[in-house]
């Protein structure tokens, strides 16, 4: 489910994530003091910088609810990045995306990991995405860990193959 503020702009949605770093008092905000305007200008610049990761800066003034599904998913990730996390949890980020959007998402996840130097925990059923970007993979079957390892180790793990593809028949 998309968890955006549909009637707010793309930029305003990102700024929601930036509010945990407010650098002015409530009184400064009420009075619209110089500290307030300075912080608002910084928030605007930071929001556009984060949006540029997904090449969404030109959509800053669009209403979030009017964006296509894939763009809304990307906006959710940008808003999460605005909180300056040390761990980014992505729960099925490619769900509902077409193949070209998924490829773009893969590139952006790697870019985020490398640029922000943050750990990313990914829960995903798109095995192409998982096998191409994950450094370590943990496979669950009915809530129990059945394998941990690299993409190559997981792809060759008999327990994983049996759990997800079925047992091989003897010829």
Enumerate the predicted regions with their spans.
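Glycine-rich phosphate-binding loops of nucleotide-dependent enzymes
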Residues: 1-171
């Amino acid at each position: 489910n998309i968890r955006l503020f549909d009637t707010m702009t793309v930029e305003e949605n990102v700024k929601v994530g930036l509010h945990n770093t407010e650098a002015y008092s409530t009184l400064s905000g009420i009075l619209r003091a110089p500290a307030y305007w300075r912080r608002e200008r910084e928030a605007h610049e930071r929001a556009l910088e984060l949006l540029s990761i997904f090449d969404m800066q030109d959509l800053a003034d669009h209403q979030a609810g009017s964006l296509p599904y894939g763009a809304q998913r990307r906006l959710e990730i940008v808003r999460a990045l605005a909180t300056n996390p040390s761990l980014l949890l992505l729960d099925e980020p490619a769900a509902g995306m077409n193949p070209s959007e998924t490829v773009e998402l893969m590139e952006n996840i790697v870019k985020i990991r490398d640029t922000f130097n943050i750990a990313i925990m990914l829960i995903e059923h798109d095995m192409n995405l998982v096998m191409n970007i994950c450094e370590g993979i943990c496979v669950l079957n009915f809530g129990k860990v059945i394998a941990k390892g690299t993409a190559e180790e997981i792809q060759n793990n008999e327990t994983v193959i049996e759990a997800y593809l079925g047992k091989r028949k003897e010829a």
